[in-house]
């Protein structure tokens, strides 16, 4: 029995069900599924648009400057598929939700953001520095705008990672509360139990959509960061 609603985020609570570390189990299961997928076995050009999911992510990447940066499309598409699977696997009862932890989301977003920053400054330091000053700004506002823009750029990996972790955590907390209320109402009122179960089913379907949307937004923002890359 779990002592509180936040116990679902503790990997050590699942040791009785899963002898191995749950983070290791979920992450490596996703990696194995990715390796075995036919997407990575067949020719990339012919298989990239085979499914609506592939079409969605590659269409978004083609709208940004990702197409001009060789080697960036593959990591972003990999992260997208991995996040979709991990988010959906986190909805399975008694399964550890990896994407609800800031350490995991930050380990995905920070390296991509840092690589973009290093690449743009190595390619053209002057153009990269010029991005910190918006065009057409008054001279007396330039120091403040540069400070604000610099701060906004450097907090991007934190806000990106926190957005995914917070949205996934909120959904799991609500599901935990619904489970507690359903268990309490099971022995009191049949009508209340039926209503709670129907509500829980509807919310689970809503969470499935959230899992897909959050994975898409995560990769969408990473691809939009490439628009600031100097060319």
Swiss-Prot record:
Origin species: Lumbricus terrestris
Identification of the protein by name: ATP synthase subunit a
Database matches in Pfam families: ATP-synt_A
Gene that encodes the chain: ATP6
Keyword check for Ion transport: yes
Classification via CDD domains: ATP-synt_Fo_a_6
Function in brief: Mitochondrial membrane ATP synthase (F(1)F(0) ATP synthase or Complex V) produces ATP from ADP in the presence of a proton gradient across the membrane which is generated by electron transport complexes of the respiratory chain. F-type ATPases consist of two structural domains, F(1) - containing the extramembraneous catalytic core and F(0) - containing the membrane proton channel, linked together by a central stalk and a peripheral stalk. During catalysis, ATP synthesis in the catalytic domain of F(1) is coupled via a rotary mechanism of the central stalk subunits to proton translocation.
Homology family: Belongs to the ATPase A chain family.
Magnesium keyword on record: no
An annotated GO cellular component: mitochondrial inner membrane
Domain of life assignment: Eukaryota
One annotated GO molecular function: proton-transporting ATP synthase activity, rotational mechanism
NCBIfam families: ATP_synt_6_or_A
Transmembrane stretches, start-end: 22-42, 76-96, 102-122, 170-190, 193-213
Subcellular compartments: Mitochondrion inner membrane
Topology within the bilayer: Multi-pass membrane protein
Main location: mitochondrion
Quaternary structure and interacting proteins, as annotated: F-type ATPases have 2 components, CF(1) - the catalytic core - and CF(0) - the membrane proton channel. CF(1) has five subunits: alpha(3), beta(3), gamma(1), delta(1), epsilon(1). CF(0) has three main subunits: a, b and c.
């Amino acid at each position: 029995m779990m002592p509180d609603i936040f116990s679902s985020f503790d990997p050590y609570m699942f040791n009785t069900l899963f002898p191995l570390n749950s983070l290791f189990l979920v992450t490596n299961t996703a990696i194995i599924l990715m390796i075995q997928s036919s997407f990575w076995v067949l020719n990339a050009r012919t298989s990239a648009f085979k499914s609506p999911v592939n079409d969605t992510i590659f269409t978004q990447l083609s709208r940004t400057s990702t197409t001009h940066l060789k080697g960036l499309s593959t990591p972003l598409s990999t992260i997208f598929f991995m996040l979709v699977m991990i988010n959906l696997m986190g909805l399975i009862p008694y399964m550890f939700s990896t994407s609800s932890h800031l350490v995991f989301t930050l380990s995905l977003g920070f390296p991509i953001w840092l690589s973009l920053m290093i690449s743009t400054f190595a390619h053209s330091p002057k153009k990269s520095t010029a991005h910190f000053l918006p065009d057409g700004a008054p001279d007396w506002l330039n120091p403040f705008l540069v400070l604000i823009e610099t701060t906004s750029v450097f907090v991007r990996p934190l806000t990106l990672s926190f957005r995914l972790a917070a949205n996934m955590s909120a959904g799991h907390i609500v599901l935990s509360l619904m489970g507690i209320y359903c268990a309490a109402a099971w022995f009191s009122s049949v009508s209340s139990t039926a209503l709670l179960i129907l509500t829980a089913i509807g919310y689970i379907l809503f969470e499935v959509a959230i899992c897909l949307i959050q994975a898409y937004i995560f990769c969408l923002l990473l691809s939009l960061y490439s628009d600031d890359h100097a060319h």
